[in-house]
Amino acid sequence: MRYYNYLTTPSGKTCNLYELKNKDYIILLKFLNGENFEGFYKKLNSLIVESIPNFFELDIIDKAYLYVAYFYYSIKTSINIKAEKFDAVEVPLTILLDSLEENYNKNILDYKFYKWDDCKVSYPSRIILKDNNIDIDYTSGLKEISEHKLTTEEVRYISENAPLYDLNQLENFITNNFSQEIYVAKNIMGIKDIKDNMINPSLFYSIAYIYKDSLEHYYNLLYLVCHYIRVQWESLLEMTPVEMMILYNNFIEDKEAQNKKHSKNKTLNLNDPNVADMMMG
């Protein structure tokens, strides 16, 4: 089941924002890892066109708003269910190590752990990108794409000023920083000056910047679900982020219920006179 959010764009148009699948976000992440921001934009653009029939009627601010909304509603919301911060998805060390011991496969996995404290770890984030089907989709998207390069100053400005998680600021940010004027010669079909908002390399980067760090952690979350809960990878790819997190949360709730039941049974056994006599020797 694909969930959707009913969204009103800055221009007042309404649409149903259907979730992308996990495999779609992984393909987007591959473009970002290669710093191919135009490829990222074109892939995201094609995915949104499929789910929003009137996409081509939207202006650039509405489109950019939708790009960020996909991130905001699917990735940010999913990660925040169990982790308020974006710096990591955390799990207890003992649980993770037990899971890794059961699932370790030297042919495809290369584990490298970074211990933060006594009970938290981070885990690798380059495992799943080797999936063959995803590679085919990714490389086919590269054929007609040429990369745009930004200056160091442009990158610095965007990284310091882009409204990463605030949809309310996005319209002003795009309007103020990325508007361009197109002047068409008056003798061409009698058209006078045209003013429009154009998509340029800086806009590719600003949208990509919003996705990049959180997609890395979202990728780690996929790894956690796949190997901790032991969901088949093919099934996980076809899920959406919300479906994945529902599965994960149900698993956690079941685990907690089992632990409480085990703890309760252990307490009851200690109150058993026979058990007490045995303990006293």
Task: Give the location of each predicted region.
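Short acidic DE-rich linear segments
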Residues: 263-281
